[in-house]
Amino acid sequence: YTGKDALKDSNEARDFHRYAAQQFAQAGADFLYAALIPTLPEAIGMAYALAETGIPYIISFTIQADGCLIDHTPIADAIAAIDDLVSPAPVCYMTNCVHPGIVMQALLQPCNQAEIIHRRFLGIQANTSALSYAELDHAADLHSSDPETLADDIMKLRSIVPLRIFGGCCGTDARHMKAIAERITE
């Protein structure tokens, strides 16, 4: 999550991720999903590698409450850069392994008050803990919220962006997914 091991150059990232993308394409994948992408250069390189397959794909960023990827690139700027550089562009963008409360803080930052967020940022795979990555990395105990609280938090997030993809990540189980599904269909 820190981005310290992320590839620093988009061409290097494209070359690194190309083999896996091509293997999934040759295996007949319906779509490709790149998760936990912490930096813009890695996201661009990943997008190039996935776009080369011709298969629809999604990029999912690692984001922080300040509204940025781990490398301090605002989410709106990262989306705009990839959409401008890579063809075909991702189907959409999302985030994973983060609590919806942190995502709400991130998307409400001035740097992300852009139409592109509302049009292109469409999903979350949520953690149940509202702690930051750094806090979770050093936590001695499992932190979790109950299913109804997580579903409420996702619905609050959905009130500011038109989320269409929902899933769980760290700390979630079938109870959390059921609560989210019930709230979406109300």
List each language-model region with its residue ranges.
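Domain-level signal for soluble alpha/beta catalytic cores
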Residues: 1-186
